[in-house]
C-alpha cells in the first residue's frame, strides 16, 4: 500500500531512472484496470457519441490484460500480446483459464489459490494421456541382448573406425576374454569399474567387458583436469581403473585403485564365450558424473532395468536395421554415449567410431557421414548449428535421423535443418542424467512454431509440471 504514494510518477521518468529499461523493458507483463462511464459523454447537447472497438496492431509489452468496469460493475477483459512470442491459440486458452479462475474464486471465496483448477475436465484428461506412455517392461538386460545379437549375426560388421573393422563375433570374443579377466579380479553385480580411454575400439571393448562381467562402468573423460578425475575416482569408490598405456601419465593415482592398461594385457588364454551372469534389473549398469556446474561433480547411477527399457523403446520407435550406420561421437562422460555405443550392437546395425576430438569438427563429421554412409547421429544444438553451416552437410544424402538434446533446440535452427536436409527426421529429446538418458521425445516440424517442443514421455515414463508444493 505504501507504493500508492508514488502512483503518479510518469512512465518517462521511470525510464530515465532505469536506463536498462530502454533496451529490455521495465516490465514485460502488465495488468491495467480502468473504470469507464460514457454516460456523461452521451448527454452532451448536440453531440451524437458512439463507442467503436479499437484493436491496436502493436503490442507495447509482451503481454497486457486490460480490465474495464462500467457503472453497473460489469467487467470487460481483453488481451494484447506480442505475436512473435505467443500464438493465438495460446492466448485463447489463457483467457479461458483466467475466466475459470475468476469463476471459482468468486463462487468459493475460501478456496486456496493453489487449489484452483485452471484446466477443464477435458484438458485434464488430455494432459493425463499426454503425460504417460505405458509399455511392457523389459525382460532381457543389456548383456543378454548383446550376446543374442552376436549369436544371430556373427559375421556381420559390428564396428568400424578409420583403418579397421570388427565383425560381431570378433568384437564379442575380445570383450568376453576381458570380461573373464575382470571376473577374476572380483568384478560382478554392482561392482563399479572406472574406464578412461580415448574413443577407440579398445574403449568399446572395455565398456562391453565391464557389462559382460556384471559390473557397472564409471566413464572418466581423459580430457578432464587431473583434480577432477581424482575426485571422481575417490568419490565413486572404484577399486579398478581400465585405461590405455599412452594415457597413464595423464591420470591421477588413487589409493586403493588398481590401474590396468588394457592394451598391455595378454588375454588369449581366457574363454571367448560370455561369462555366466545372474543379473537383476535393479543392479547398476553405469554411473555417470554430471558436469559439476553447481559444485563438485555428482555420480548418477542407472540400473539395468532402466537402461534396457530405454534401449527397447528406442528400437521400437526408431527401428534401426542392418542397413543403418550410427556414428558414436559423444564423449563417454555424456550419457548420450550410452545409447550411441549399445543401441547399434543390439540391433545388428553398424557402429562407426569417430576419432578422438573429431566430434568438435563439423567438416570432419560431414566427411565421415559421406565416407561411411552414416544414417543416424546425435548433436547438441551448438554443434548442430556448426554442422548445418558446413557446406558439406548438404551433401550428406545418407542421413535419415538426427537427434538433438542437451540444450534447448532453437526454432530457427530446427527449420534450417529441416529445409536443408528434407529427407532427414529431426528428433528433439530431453532428459536429465538421473532418468536414464531421456524422458521425452518429439519429431520436429517446421510448423512447431518459435520453440521446439521437448515432446511427450517415453514408454514407462510420465511427465508433468509441478509447483514447489508438488501440486500438478
Go through each PLM region and give its residues.
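Adenylate-forming AMP-binding core of the ANL superfamily, especially NRPS adenylation
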Residues: 65-66, 146-147, 168-172, 176-179, ...
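Small-residue-rich loop/turn and linker elements
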Residues: 10-28, 32, 106-128, 194, ...
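Adenylate-forming
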Residues: 198, 245-248, 330-333, 356-358, ...
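Acyl/amide activation-and-transfer machinery of modular secondary-metabolite enzymes
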Residues: 24-34, 59-84, 121-132, 153-156, ...
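Conserved AMP-binding/adenylation subdomain of ANL enzymes
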Residues: 298-327, 335-375, 442-444
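His-Asp-centered acyl/peptidyl-transfer active-site segments
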Residues: 1-54, 61, 73, 83-87, ...
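Carrier-protein-dependent adenylate-forming modules in NRPS/ANL systems
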Residues: 7, 72-115, 133-308, 316-319, ...
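Core catalytic subdomain of AMP-forming adenylate-forming
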Residues: 32, 36, 60-61, 99, ...
Amino acid at each position: 500500500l505504501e507504493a500508492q504514494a508514488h502512483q503518479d510518477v510518469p512512465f518517462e521518468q521511470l525510464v530515465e531512472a532505469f536506463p536498462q529499461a530502454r533496451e529490455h523493458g521495465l516490465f514485460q507483463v502488465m495488468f491495467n484496470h480502468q473504470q469507464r462511464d460514457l454516460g456523461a459523454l452521451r448527454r452532451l447537447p448536440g453531440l451524437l457519441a458512439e463507442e467503436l472497438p479499437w484493436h491496436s496492431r502493436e503490442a507495447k509489452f509482451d503481454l497486457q490484460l486490460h480490465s474495464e468496469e462500467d457503472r453497473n460493475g460489469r467487467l470487460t477483459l481483453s488481451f494484447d500480446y506480442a505475436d512473435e512470442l505467443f500464438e493465438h491459440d495460446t492466448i485463447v486458452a489463457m483467457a479461458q483459464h483466467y475466466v475459470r479462475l475468476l469463476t471459482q474464486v468468486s463462487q468459493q471465496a475460501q478456496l486456496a489459490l493453489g487449489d484452483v483448477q485452471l484446466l477443464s475436465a477435458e484438458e485434464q484428461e488430455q494432459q493425463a494421456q499426454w503425460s504417460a506412455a505405458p509399455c511392457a517392461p523389459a525382460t532381457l538386460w543389456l548383456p543378454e541382448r548383446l550376446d543374442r545379437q552376436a549369436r544371430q549375426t556373427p559375421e556381420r560388421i559390428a564396428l568400424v573406425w578409420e583403418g579397421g573393422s570388427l565383425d560381431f563375433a570378433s568384437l564379442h570374443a575380445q570383450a568376453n576374454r576381458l570380461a573373464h579377466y575382470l571376473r577374476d579380479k572380483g568384478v560382478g553385480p554392482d561392482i563399479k569399474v572406472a574406464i578412461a580411454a580415448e574413443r577407440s575400439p579398445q574403449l568399446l571393448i572395455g565398456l562391453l567387458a565391464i557389462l559382460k562381467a556384471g559390473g557397472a562402468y564409471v566413464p572418466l573423460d581423459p580430457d578432464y583436469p587431473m583434480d577432477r578425475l581424482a575426485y571422481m575416482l575417490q568419490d565413486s569408490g572404484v577399486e579398478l581403473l581400465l585405461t590405455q598405456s599412452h594415457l597413464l601419465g595423464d591420470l591421477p593415482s588413487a589409493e586403493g585403485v588398481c590401474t590396468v592398461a588394457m592394451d598391455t594385457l595378454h588375454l588369449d588364454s581366457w574363454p571367448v564365450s560370455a561369462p555366466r551372469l545372474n543379473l537383476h534389473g535393479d543392479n547398476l549398469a553405469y554411473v555417470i558424473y554430471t558436469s559439476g556446474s553447481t559444485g563438485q561433480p555428482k555420480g548418477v547411477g542407472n540400473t539395468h532395468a532402466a537402461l534396457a527399457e530405454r534401449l527397447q523403446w528406442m528400437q521400437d520407435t526408431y527401428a534401426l536395421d542392418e542397413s543403418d550406420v550410427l556414428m558414436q561421437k559423444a564423449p563417454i562422460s555424456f550419457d548420450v554415449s550410452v545409447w550411441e555405443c549399445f543401441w547399434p550392437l543390439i540391433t545388428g546395425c553398424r557402429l562407426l567410431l569417430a576419432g578422438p576430438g573429431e566430434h568438435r569438427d563439423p567438416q570432419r563429421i560431414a566427411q565421415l557421414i559421406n565416407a561411411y554412409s552414416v544414417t543416424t547421429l546425435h548433436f547438441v544444438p551448438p554443434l548442430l548449428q556448426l554442422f548445418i553451416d558446413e557446406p558439406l552437410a548438404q551433401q550428406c544424402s545418407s542421413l535419415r535421423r538426427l537427434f538433438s538434446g542437451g540444450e534447448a533446440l532453437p526454432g530457427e535452427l530446427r527449420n534450417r535443418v529441416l529445409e536443408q536436409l528434407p529427407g532427414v527426421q529431426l528428433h528433439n529429446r530431453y532428459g536429465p542424467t538421473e532418468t536414464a538418458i531421456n524422458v521425452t521425445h518429439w519429431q520436429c516440424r517446421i510448423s512447431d512454431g518459435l520453440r521446439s517442443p521437448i515432446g511427450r514421455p517415453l514408454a514407462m515414463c510420465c511427465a508433468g509440471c509441478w509447483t514447489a508444493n508438488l501440486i500438478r
